[in-house]
Design a protein with these regions (language model features):
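N-terminal pre-domain/capping segments
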Residues: 1-98
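Short, well-ordered coil/turn segments that N-cap beta-strands
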Residues: 9-14, 35-38, 67-73, 106-109, ...
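Active-site beta-loop-alpha junctions enriched in small/polar residues
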Residues: 17-21, 42-46, 78-82, 116-118, ...
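Short, well-ordered alpha-helical microsegments
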Residues: 23-26, 163-167, 227
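Acidic/histidine-rich catalytic cores of soluble enzymes
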Residues: 39, 140-223
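Charged helix-capping and loop-helix junction motifs
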Residues: 53-60, 89-97, 130-138, 190-198, ...
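Alpha-helix-loop-beta-strand connector modules within alpha/beta enzyme cores
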Residues: 59-76, 135-148, 227-235
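Active-site acidic/histidine proton-transfer and metal-coordination neighborhood
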Residues: 67, 84-177
Length: 235
């Protein structure tokens, strides 16, 4: 029998992603529940019409595993889409809705969404959203909202190579929340503790990961003072 070694910090709910080991959803989650009280179910690739998403049978099995282990869920929505055109925005919105409807059975506290015009990473800083892009995204969010248990359950994530105020108009114009990706801010050479007081009223959850040549690495790569600067204000 595996001895649990859950990461717990007073005052914070610590989680992990659904793939701390390279395996399919069900065996991977069976491993995750030994280490965290909150699991981010990664549904990053939906495909053209949702064919790449997790199956309803897998969702039912994950619900049982989580209930037995007493863990909670958040869901990272598909990232293989964007709002570059009306057509791409329509397809992306449909897949976001598919993913939300599929995972409602898990009763996630948050669904995390990327808001991009081009989902293929590039080396340059993205420009601010145009008025037309903003209107397109707001229409999409209006379509997504009825599928949520509450509007604030949808959290828009800040991304690297995007201006820090990229999401400001969207957050202020909707009842949705922020997912504060701290690692993305570090990756841009900025100080997340300076953004925290500005964004805190809208933050629903945070992504915390280290940097070592790239992001999404162990926090062991980060200096203690760097971690303290952002974590202490949260306590």
């Amino acid at each position: 029998m595996k001895t649990p070694h859950k990461c717990r910090v007073p005052g914070l709910n610590i989680g992990c992603t659904s793939f701390i080991i390279p395996d399919y959803y069900v065996p991977a989650i069976r491993e995750c529940v030994h280490y965290a009280d909150d699991i981010a179910l990664l549904l990053l690739e939906a495909g053209e019409h949702g064919e790449g998403l997790i199956t309803p049978a897998e969702i039912r099995e994950l619900a049982g595993i989580a209930a037995d282990a007493g863990v909670k869920w958040n869901v990272h929505l598909p990232t293989d889409g964007g709002f570059a055109t009306e057509e791409s925005g329509r397809r992306y919105t449909e897949n976001i809705i598919r993913a939300i409807d599929l995972t409602r059975e898990l009763e996630p506290h948050t669904w995390v969404m990327h808001v991009v015009t081009d989902h293929i990473p590039g080396p340059d800083m993205r420009p601010h959203l145009t008025e037309r892009e903003t209107e397109r995204i707001l229409r999409s969010l209006e379509q997504i909202t009825p599928h949520l248990p509450a509007p604030e359950c949808l959290a828009l994530e800040n991304l690297e190579r995007h201006p820090t105020d990229y999401l400001d108009k969207l957050v202020s114009a909707t009842p949705h929340s922020r997912c504060f990706d701290i690692g993305h801010v570090w990756k841009e050479g900025l100080r997340p503790e300076e953004l925290l007081p500005l964004w805190l009223p809208d933050i629903r959850m945070c992504h915390l990961h280290g940097l070592e040549k790239r992001d999404h690495k162990s926090l062991h790569h980060m200096a203690a003072a760097t971690l303290d600067a952002i974590l202490h204000p949260m306590w």
